[in-house]
Amino acid sequence: MAAIGWPGIVAIISVAISFIIMAADWVGPDITFTILLSWLTAFDGKIITVAKAAAGYGNTGLLTVIFLYWVAEGVTQTGGLELVMNYVLGRSRSVHWALVRSMFPVMVLSAFLNNTPCVTFMIPILMSWARRCGVPPKKLLIPLSYAAVLGGTCTSIGTSTNLVIVGMQDTRYNKQNKEDEAKFGMFDIAPYGVPYALMGFVFIILTQRFLLPGNSSRYAKDLLIAVRVLPSSPVVKKKLKDSGLRTQTGFSLAGLWRGGAMTRQVDPDTVLEANDILYCAGELDVVEFVGEEFGLGLVTAETERALTDGQAVGDSEATAFHDTGASPYKKLVQVTMTKTADLVGRTVREVSWQGRFGLIPVAIQRGNGREDGRLNDVVLAAGDVLILDTTPHFDEARDDFKINFEKLRFVKDGAAKEFVIGVKVKKNSEVVNKTVTAAGLRGVPGLFVLSVDRADGSSVDASDYLYKIQPGDTLWLAADVGAVGFLSKFPGLELVQQEQVDKTGTSILYRHLVQAAVSHKGPLVGKTVRDVRFRTLYNAAIVAVHREGVRVPLKVQDIVLQGGDVLLISCHTKWAEEHRMDKAFVLVQAVPDSSPPKRGRMAIGVLLVVGMVLTQIVGGLKEKEYIHLWPAAVLTAALMLLTGCMNADQARKAIMWDVYLTIAAAFGVSAALENTGVAGKVANAIISIGKSIGGDGPALIAIYVATAVMSELLTNNAAGAIMYPIAAIAGDQLKIPAVDISVAIMLGASAGFINPFSYQTNLMVYAAGNYSVREFATIGAPFQIWLMVVASFILCYMKQWKQVWIATWSITAFIVFVPALLTLLPHTVQNRMEAFFDRIAEAINPRAALQRRRSARAQSFGGKAMSVGSTESRTDGSSTPDVALTFIEMPKMGVR
């Protein structure tokens, strides 16, 4: 092949610069590829002509991707997927079975629906389910993304990349009049994708103990936090060993204060009493979860000081794990004491925290091994990490704050708009005869149960963790807008204001929620919702009201509106546009994903999707395409529109135009690389690998690895589109079937597991689970290596796919069910195996092992030393001081 001329050099340099821009995340791939393609057309057709550059925008594979978003939106709007998944998930108490129950259904679902919608609706379902089952949500969210990706490798419609490759293969070989080579059936990838997915699933199951993060967070670890056992807590009158507190992951009980006496080593047979003070060693978010689950309230330094001074302290003067509405304090923050802080050397008691900073100490992480007593007696030192509650006077921009503190992080933000919203329990609701926790309504991000109004007129406080919900009960909840969307889709519940909503006459098909801020000079100020006759005047119903700094406890109709109040309104989809300039409001905006589910259309939506899939299955079995997936998707979506599964606006918004632009432009860029001979040169390198080793396998492995690496740096769609012409040239020269080439690229393009920004579903769970990049890489890097080995084996033995299927299914079945068989062994054998796996875990992940040792030491020997200052060896050979545990010694009087 001749040397690459100047057009090829320009193309290489241009693509390289674009890769750097996208890898650094300076500009998104949709904009970058579009500009790159336009630039490559500016050389009088020497690199690529305008006509060829524009051809990608009409590619049938790309059009299929776009219109499948309509189908996914239609079935999601009916609420059918949530109902099915809640039923399939069931209940589990172990991480092993939780992963099995959550990953398998998602893998099956994502084989036929786009990954992004699957993960979007599964995140809140999975988080609620995890809380309900007592499993750390962080153990499940990364596997959720991986399961969606793995499931997508099982069919040609499983991912947008698969459809793109199918479209490119069809276009390439039809132009060459090779119709047999152009065909790629719906299940042509299944013989290789299913074993690939199963082995990925097996890896997650085997390594979840060692590599998956638990309830760890990005914030300070090994804090010692004091909590009070609330009178209605389910642990009252239970022995410690029977309470469930000792079995919580990442949570250790290090001491107990009762009746003026401190117990450093708590006997497992100790019976817990109301108002006991428990000293919990762990991370703030772990203690928060356990506190909400078991009915525990947080104790602050201010509470301790008041008690020490002999003052009576009410509940409103302490901080709860969730804003209770009684306290004006809205956020918990984490800060580090600076070296130049004038607070260094002073005790916590000596600092006027509220007056000077608008802050109240909650916990301190120590690292120097000094003996400290009560929280107020701790002598502050540079480098101390503090968890602080904020007051309305807190201002991070003040010079005084900057001098004393650095590394500010908002650990818990309660200042987001929070609405009080009421929901009624329907007669046949699944939550009937369940506690709030068992119903999945406690521990949901942005949602907090305030109280329950019973059907007989009596009221139950939210702190009653034992109350079982009954038909006709009204649950009053504090919820941000995201949680309101979750509530609107929760089966068996309906809004208290539902009657008012129905009276507006707006069809459920065009109903959604809007936020509208009341103008300070508008006509609504000073009037109740009832006096205004809001529904009659605006043809909309107020569902809830948010008032800055104050939780509004009144029923909506009786609230006297004030300027600045934010109204949550159920209305027609065009209401926001019609009232955007209304003098009564200063800000009107729609709440995303707030349309109520059209459950009456659920069966229709599911049947239409099944019908669409069946057209492709039958066509594949008959080796005759009855209808292409693109028009099949459009017709399915059209029927969904006609039957009321979704409306036209929802269909328009469902299309991800950034994906469309990225794929379309990447088609043109790949064509430019082929026209200039660059693709051929790279293909020659792959051909050389194949010829030097021998056989098709090495060449296919090289294609897979190159695509996988590119997928980590770019998007999966871009990686597939860029690599296809290169791989196709190599395949043609090596006489490798076109289907095999496409399979290698499809598998490689989906292999974006290390970088949370490499795949859209990764990014979604990264944000929802509050992961760090390191946590993602800890599981992602070995997972990537494992799948490269698996893919290499599969690609080398493609002709023996039946034997590979039998082997992988057998391995999967063994891994899934062996834990159930192990429970039949004697307890002594089980304990030895547990210890053996613990040693393996320590060898693989020393950081996690260190955290477990600290927790165990705090739980078993917490009373023998108030501060622990020993050092632990780090993996890099250095040492780091262990964290001192600072106990809050409580005086003999009433406690919070």
From Swiss-Prot:
InterPro entries for this protein: Cit_transptr-like_dom, DASS-Related_Transporters, RCK_C, RCK_C_sf
One GO MF annotation is: monoatomic cation transmembrane transporter activity
Q: What induces it?
A: Down-regulated by sulfur deprivation.
Q: Where is this region: Disordered?
A: 857-881
Q: Which SUPFAM superfamilies match?
A: TrkA C-terminal domain-like
Its predominant location is membrane
Query: Where does the record say this protein resides?
Result: Cell membrane
Instruction: Please provide an example of a Pfam family that matches this protein in its UniProt record.
Output: CitMHS
Recorded GO cellular component terms are:
plasma membrane
Q: Which residues form the RCK C-terminal domain?
A: 212-296, 319-404, 408-493, 499-586
Annotated membrane-spanning segments are 1-21, 47-69, 106-126, 140-160, 186-206, 602-622, 626-646, 654-674, 685-705, 734-754, 776-796, 804-824
Enumerate the UniProt keywords alphabetically. Answer: Cell membrane, Membrane, Repeat, Stress response, Sulfate transport, Symport, Transmembrane, Transmembrane helix, Transport
Top-level taxon of origin: Eukaryota
Per UniProt, what is the membrane topology? Multi-pass membrane protein
Which portions of the chain have biased composition (kind: Polar residues)?
868-881
User: Which BP terms does GO give this entry?
Assistant: potassium ion transport
Family the UniProt entry places it in: Belongs to the divalent anion:Na+ symporter (DASS) superfamily. Na+/sulfate symporter (TC 2.A.47.4) family.
Briefly state the protein's biological role: Na(+)/sulfate cotransporter with a probable low-affinity for sulfate.
| Name of the protein described by the UniProt record | Probable sodium/sulfate cotransporter 3
Q: Which organism is it from?
A: Chlamydomonas reinhardtii
- Upper taxonomic lineage: Eukaryota, Viridiplantae, Chlorophyta, core chlorophytes, Chlorophyceae
